Regions:
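Interfacial/gating helices of multi-pass transporter permease domains
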Residues: 7-26, 92-100, 127, 161
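Alpha-helical structural context
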Residues: 9-10, 87, 125, 153
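Short runs within selected transmembrane alpha-helices of multi-pass transporters and secretion channels
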Residues: 33-36, 105-124, 130-140, 146, ...
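Short alpha-helical transmembrane segments in multi-pass integral membrane proteins
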Residues: 43-108, 150-189
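Short, small-residue-biased leader/transition segments that mark boundaries at the very start
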Residues: 1-6
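Small-residue-rich hydrophobic transmembrane alpha-helices
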Residues: 17-81, 112-135
């Protein structure tokens, strides 16, 4: 099946490294989801009260906070990921490869943070459909498409490069949506 093709293409060290890198990455983006929830609440309350300027301001402040905080957590993980992986596995090859691929993606953390929080801010205005399409489309078209192109020449590194590129593009798309959203100009329903 497809799992066997994946295993043959990448090998057991790459599969283990991928698993550990995904686990460690989760530590970096948790703060972004927290700030995204706060953005939904702050923007939603302001928007519901008819204060659209304040709603947009809260959205922008939260997005900046999310991007900065995730840049910081990404930077810390970039430094400390060898230690994190030493806790997760005794295998030096897996630790080294996990750190290598995770560091590729960590460069995109500020954009990932911006996308998470922008989606939350837009959700607070009731703008859910377009951000959902942007998320879905970027993952299924950009990330998957690039991964298919890059996996053969670059293996697991190619998959993580594809993810980093997609996260940057998604971040830019959602920042653009936040900047141009008509919802900040419309009265609450």
């Amino acid at each position: 099946g497809l799992g066997d093709v994946y295993k043959r293409q990448l090998g057991s060290i790459a599969i283990a490294a991928n698993s550990f890198a995904v686990t460690a990455e989760g530590l970096c983006y948790m703060p972004g989801y927290g700030i995204g929830s706060a953005a939904t609440t702050l923007v939603g309350r302001s928007y519901g009260a008819g204060n659209y300027k304040l709603a947009k301001r809260y959205g922008n402040i939260c997005i900046a906070m999310g991007a900065v905080l995730m840049a910081i957590t990404g930077g810390l993980m970039m430094i400390f990921c060898p230690f994190v992986f030493s806790i997760l596995t005794p295998d030096p090859q897996v630790r080294s490869f996990a750190a290598e691929v995770l560091r590729i993606e960590l460069l995109a953390e500020p954009f990932f943070g911006a996308s998470i929080v922008a989606a939350g801010a837009l959700r607070g205005t009731g703008d859910t459909f377009v951000p959902s399409l942007l998320n879905l489309g970027s993952i299924w078209v950009i990330r998957l498409g690039l991964a298919v192109l890059l996996i053969t020449p670059l293996g697991l590194r190619g998959m993580w490069i594809a993810m980093a590129i997609e996260l940057c593009i998604r971040g830019l798309l959602l920042l653009y949506r936040q900047h141009t959203s008509k919802y900040y100009k419309l009265p609450a329903a």
